[in-house]
Amino acid sequence: VEVEQDGQQVKVGFQVIALSDTTFKSTAFIGGLPGAGWERGAETRTSEGKLEGDIISWTSEDGNVARSKLVEAGIGLINDDGEVTDTIPKVHRKSKTLGAKPPEGAVVLFDGSAESVKNFERGEAVLGKLLRHDCESKQKFGDHKLHLEFRTPYMPFARGQGRGNSGMYIQGRYEVQVLDSFGLDGKNNECGGIYSISEPKVNMCLPPLSWQTYDYDFTAAKYDADGKKVKNARVTIKHNGVVIHDDLELPNHTPGKHPEADSPGLLYLQGHGNPVVYRNVWVVEK
């Protein structure tokens, strides 16, 4: 939506997080939604929401209270008489790379078929043609590009690392976090973060139950004849079609799986006890 601020029209994007069946947190991103106007470090404002009947009362950081209710187009702001005076339209965001087709020569790791499940140790198809978390590819890769799609569950009563947690381990060595981080800051242990190494440039996480994408271009670490590392690994990653790490140097492996080595590595989709699922996983070797 556009609002007036200091005499100028300014775009504001809102993301609403469910914290239970009746409590919510709203973050207003001044400039637009993350990746569509708002950039890390720009202004945000938060409000706490409480549902009573069909009315949500929002209390802002400075104590102001506004009331709203759901309408067909989104969130309707209401006056003291319960009349809708304005509407914040709901936006359904979709990754630019959702449904990307593997190019000729790609290694298709999972396409929903029973045969492709066999490409993974502990591979298991669930909910029809989706790949369950906690599995690793049998094939190993050096320099490569990868596309995959993932979906986190709706867990409104969970918090932090217990909310839709999994992870995509490049070569089984470098974890790119998978988590329901919708509306959060985007830290290195949240969705899109490279665990313990780098936070994403912008938090592009979509709401839980939305299909999301990771696309990366990875160059493995290089070693000399004596097995000494002479060049760190590097990676560029897109989350939902937006670059969140741009030619990032990876100085070391991340915790939880395999150490760095002068050898190809597998794709590991971490199991963390939450029902995260994957689909459309393919690799292009470089």
What residues fall within each predicted segment?
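Mature N-terminal, pre-catalytic/accessory segment of carbohydrate-active enzymes
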Residues: 2-12
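Carbohydrate-interacting regions of secretory-pathway proteins
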Residues: 10-11, 17-286
